[in-house]
């Protein structure tokens, strides 16, 4: 379970940052940033974990509790066009920078999930497996996952048949079969695999 030890060791205002959506065949990559109150109640901390370990209902409950606790949370995306122009890593880092810039509170330090840190105007520390280690990063992972899933559900209503409300744009059999049968939409990532040749 993630804890608050890294944040406490750094002192000051610490934001956790994570992204979701690097691997899908369609849709944006979304990042979120979270600054948790130092006195976060233990019953709320117990709700927070790596978003991949939580059900949709658990993620919704955790985010609602975090907002109620006074956590500062923001999210931002990089579009399919930006992914094509920059590459997925650089687009992910762009979304992270945008999420940090949107925070209502400027952090003194940022903890980011993964091996590569975005270029930010404050110190930034990458934490491999951070969404399972840091409460702030885990909170960001929950927010990013919810924001991206909601975006893909909206796109699913505009482009029915690809199953995006269920597969979030990942390359499931249903999604791959739909690409073969229905073709490619403007929200597919060209160059992501043999079904999506470069434009």
Swiss-Prot record:
Residue span, RNase H type-2 domain: 12-199
Highest rank taxon of the organism: Bacteria
EC number: 3.1.26.4
Protein keywords: Cytoplasm, Endonuclease, Hydrolase, Manganese, Metal-binding, Nuclease
Reactions this protein catalyses: Endonucleolytic cleavage to 5'-phosphomonoester
Any one GO biological process: DNA replication, removal of RNA primer
Cellular component annotations (GO), alphabetically ordered: cytoplasm; ribonuclease H2 complex
Pfam families linked: RNase_HII
Coiled coil: none
Cofactor(s) needed: Mn(2+); Mg(2+)
Record's cofactor remark: Manganese or magnesium. Binds 1 divalent metal ion per monomer in the absence of substrate. May bind a second metal ion after substrate binding.
Locations listed in the record: Cytoplasm
Sites where the protein binds a divalent metal cation: 18-19, 113
Record-level Gene Ontology MF annotations: manganese ion binding; RNA binding; RNA-DNA hybrid ribonuclease activity
Leading EC class: hydrolase
UniProt cross-references to InterPro entries, sorted A to Z: RNase_HII, RNase_HII/HIII, RNase_HII/HIII_dom, RNaseH-like_sf, RNaseH_sf
Annotated function: Endonuclease that specifically degrades the RNA of RNA-DNA hybrids.
Record family assignment: Belongs to the RNase HII family.
Listed HAMAP family: RNase_HII_B
Protein name, per record: Ribonuclease HII
């Amino acid at each position: 379970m993630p804890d608050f030890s890294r944040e406490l060791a750094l002192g000051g205002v610490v934001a956790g940052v994570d992204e979701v959506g690097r691997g899908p065949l369609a849709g944006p990559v979304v990042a979120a940033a979270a600054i948790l109150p130092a006195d976060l109640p233990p019953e709320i901390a117990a709700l927070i974990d790596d978003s991949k370990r939580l059900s949709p209902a658990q993620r919704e409950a955790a985010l609602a509790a975090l907002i109620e606790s006074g956590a500062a949370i923001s999210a931002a995306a990089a579009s399919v066009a930006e992914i094509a122009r920059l590459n997925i890593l650089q687009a992910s880092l762009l979304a992270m920078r945008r999420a940090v810039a949107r925070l209502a509170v400027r952090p003194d330090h940022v903890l980011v999930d993964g091996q590569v840190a975005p270029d930010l105007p404050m110190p930034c520390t990458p934490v491999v497996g951070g969404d399972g280690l840091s409460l702030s990063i885990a909170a960001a992972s929950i927010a990013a996952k919810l924001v991206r899933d909601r975006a893909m559900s909206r796109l699913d209503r505009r482009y029915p048949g690809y199953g995006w409300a269920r597969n979030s744009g990942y390359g499931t059999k249903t999604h791959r079969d739909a690409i073969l049968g229905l073709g490619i939409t403007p929200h597919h990532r060209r160059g992501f695999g043999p079904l999506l040749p470069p434009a």
